[in-house]
Each structure stands twice: as structure tokens, then as C-alpha cells.
Amino acid sequence: MQTEIDASVIVKEKEWLETNVLPEFWESMSEGLKEALNLISSDDPTVLVFTSPKTDAVKGIVSRSSSNVVRVNVTAKVGRTTHVLKLKDSAIIHLDQILNLSNYMHYALYCLPRLRHNTERAIKELQEILHAIVCLLHSIMQEESEKEEIPSNASSISLKSQNSIVSRTSNPFSCLNHSPRQIHKTVRNHLFSPPLPSNLALSFSISNASVCLHLFRLSGPNEVLESFAKNSVDIEMLKPFVSQRIDAFSQDPILLAVTAKLSALQKKVNDVSYRFKTISSSLYGAK
């Protein structure tokens, strides 16, 4: 008799959650995703200042608009030589991490109305998508070669001391079976004016709500370096030829706001998931 009463109470609690909590939850998830998507998709340029307070290795300005870098005007000292890194006026650099981030948010918004009838599946799907997004925003490009670490107005990251993080985030899509491996590529040298010399390679990534600039000095056969300079290549291909690496980081206020919103949404999903799992396990135990 007591078991039947307990089961009845648990069923009523589950019904109350579905009636009073879930509608507001779905609405807040949809609104939060739309707000984050609008922020990250804005075409208004975000100007990022790269400075090196302890050294003068890297200094200048980078502008991001939506998922593209649209302006680069940076000076970099590599060895004894100072290079001017200036993106051509008509050129853009695609930030694949931000493009993937936008795609995931579009996918989440697409799934929400189609999965709401199946609470357990919808919550699980949202957990996976949001986990992938948060991993994507915190992914760190692995570094195995010698580099010079450059701080900026955002805290610099010691990549060699982050191996445990890299192992979890070098593939930020691993929690979704259909997702590809994140690949970091170089920028074609001819997109700059003047073009970068063939012994230099430049790449951008996103980490900890910052835009990260990675500059590589290369050594090797001229034909290999010329091939790298003409193409956008996977950073992994450069590693045998890297003699120096310089990293600079500048925190992006829009990425910071998006990260905060998505982290809050992730917490909401986890809280609702925990409540339903608790009710389900209690209901099972009462039978």
C-alpha cells in the first residue's frame, strides 16, 4: 500500500514538472540559443588588440566579423627580423571553429521543436550539442614543437602544460558521432600585402573565448616551403618543419558573452536532466 502511495506521489511530481517546468525550460533554451547565435553571427566588426607587455614580439590589431577575420594589421619580430602582417583589403580568413559553432546552434534550434514530445531524448541531444559547443569554444591547438609564448590582453596559455586538456578538446566534436575532427589550417601567404615569406606560416584559432594568433617560422627545402605558402594546410603537416612558434591571444568580448550564455544553458539542461533522472529512478524503486 505504501509503495503504491509513493509511486503515485512520484508520478504526480513528474506530471507537475512536465506541465509547469518544461514549457518554460524549452522557451528559455530556444531564446538563449537565438541570443547566442545572433551575437556570434553579427557582421559588426569586433576589433581585437594584440599586445605583448613583456616583449614586443607581436603587436597590432585583428578584426573579426561573424566567422571571418576581416582585418589583420600586426607587426611580428621573428628572430632579428620584423615582419608586417597586413591582410589585403578584399581578403578574409575563415574561422572554422566559429562557423561550426553557428552550425551547432542552428542544429539545436532545428531539433528543439521536433524532439520536445520525447523529453528524455531531447534533453540528451541538447546535452551532447551544448557539450560539443563548449568544447569547441575552449579547444586548444596542440603544440609539440619549440615555441616562444607571447602574452596579450588575455592570459597567455602554456600549451605544453595543457596536454590533458588537449587530449579532451583537440577533437571537440567527439561527443557527437557524426561530427568531423577539428582541423586548424594556415592562411595562404598571398592574402597578405606584402605576401608573407615562404618561411613563415600563420594560423588562427579560438580558445577560452579568445582569438589566438599562431605564427610559425619554418625551415626546410624551398620547394616544400613554397608549397605550404601557396596553400592552406593542416598545422599537423607543418610540425616537422617548425623551428619557432609564436602565440598571441586576445580575448573577444562577444565570444566571452556567448560562452557565458551557452554555459548557463548547459547548466539548465543538466539540472533538468538530473531532476528527471531522479524521478525515474525513484519511480523504478517504488515499483
Curated annotation (Swiss-Prot):
Its main location: cytoplasm. InterPro entries: RAVE2/Rogdi. It is found in: Cytoplasm; Nucleus. Disruption phenotype: Leads to mild sensitivity to a range of drugs including doxorubicin, cycloheximide, and bleomycine, as well as to calcium. One of its GO terms (biological process) is cellular response to calcium ion. It holds the Pfam family Rogdi_lz. It comes from the Eukaryota. PANTHER family: LEUCINE ZIPPER CONTAINING TRANSCRIPTION FACTOR LZF1, PROTEIN ROGDI HOMOLOG. This is Regulator of V-ATPase in vacuolar membrane protein 2. The lineage of its organism: Eukaryota, Fungi, Dikarya, Ascomycota, Taphrinomycotina.
